[in-house]
């Protein structure tokens, strides 16, 4: 699917540009790159940010930082309202040169929204002051550690299977079903997962499930509904979640959920 054009990045007086976008569930922005850094802020809904070697879940009220010239794609998991800001190479030097999923606090949220809303209205000096403060807040924001490894893009068959699992990580879809869809044997796919990702299919899918569940909990969704969507009973899901992350789903939601703020 064609990607939307970024805003005009040629005005040197404005080293940060902002734009608001919305996408339906299932939408995909194909892989691309640009010379400016980018922050994608999920106001509501969830997206997956895919780079050449990993996928990062971006739940509501979270943002992802992309350094300049990093090839990336976006897959929308649920109806998405987002705010994007583009940072010039000069401003981007104040931030890390790797992708980061950030917890968006009240001040950073207001800065991102203001930078988008006032993109064409504020005078350059005022806008630059907002941009400098936003960079400081981005550097101070708390980070998320949830990441899912992806195979090399040259392995198109395995990458397509991984993307299918990310779209529906339920236990109901096993390696046998994936092998049948791919026209390969279970043994062949097992070897591909181990060789390309350093782990077996079950372990990799569990990482996807944890990322998906964590995003849903941050969004305030009920534990039973999340468990059912992933193919678990509520008790089995809670046991798996606690075993992997050290806290129960309810405890995780209480710590991380942020009420929706448009």
Q: Where is each model-derived feature located?
A:
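Short beta-strand segments in beta-sandwich/barrel cores
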Residues: 29, 44-50, 63-64, 72
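Generic protein-terminus/edge-of-domain signal
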Residues: 1-46
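Terminal helix-turn-helix DNA-binding modules in bacterial transcription factors
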Residues: 172, 176, 184, 195-235, ...
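Short, Lys/Arg-enriched, Trp-marked, Pro/Gly-tolerant hinge/linker segments that flank
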Residues: 119-182, 195-207
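Ligand-binding loop in jelly-roll beta-barrel domains
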Residues: 69-99
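Short acidic-glycine-tyrosine-enriched beta hairpin
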Residues: 53-68
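A secondary-structure capping/hinge motif
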Residues: 193-200, 240-252
């Amino acid at each position: 699917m064609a990607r939307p054009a970024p805003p005009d990045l040629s005005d040197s007086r404005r080293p940060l540009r902002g734009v608001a976008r919305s996408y339906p569930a299932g939408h995909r922005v194909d892989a691309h790159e640009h010379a400016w850094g980018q922050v994608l802020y999920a106001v509501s809904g969830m997206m997956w940010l895919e780079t050449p070697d990993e996928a990062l879940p971006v739940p509501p009220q979270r943002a992802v930082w992309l350094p300049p010239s990093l090839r990336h794609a976006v897959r929308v998991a649920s109806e998405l309202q987002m705010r994007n800001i583009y940072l010039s190479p000069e401003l981007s030097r104040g931030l890390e040169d790797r992708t980061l999923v950030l917890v968006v606090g009240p001040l950073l949220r207001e800065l991102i929204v203001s930078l988008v809303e006032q993109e064409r209205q504020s005078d350059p000096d005022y806008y630059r002051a907002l941009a400098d403060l936003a960079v400081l807040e981005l550097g101070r924001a708390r980070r998320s550690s949830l990441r899912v490894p992806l195979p090399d893009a040259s392995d198109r068959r395995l990458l397509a299977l991984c993307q299918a699992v990310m779209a529906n990580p339920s236990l109901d879809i096993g390696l046998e079903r994936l092998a049948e869809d791919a026209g390969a044997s279970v043994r062949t796919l097992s070897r591909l997962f181990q060789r390309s990702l350093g782990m077996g299919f079950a372990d990799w899918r569990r990482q996807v499930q944890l990322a998906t569940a964590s995003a849903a909990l941050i969004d305030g969704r009920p534990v039973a509904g999340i468990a059912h969507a992933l193919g678990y009973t509520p008790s089995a899901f809670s046991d798996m979640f606690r075993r992997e992350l050290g806290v129960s789903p309810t405890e995780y939601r209480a710590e991380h959920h942020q009420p929706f703020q448009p």
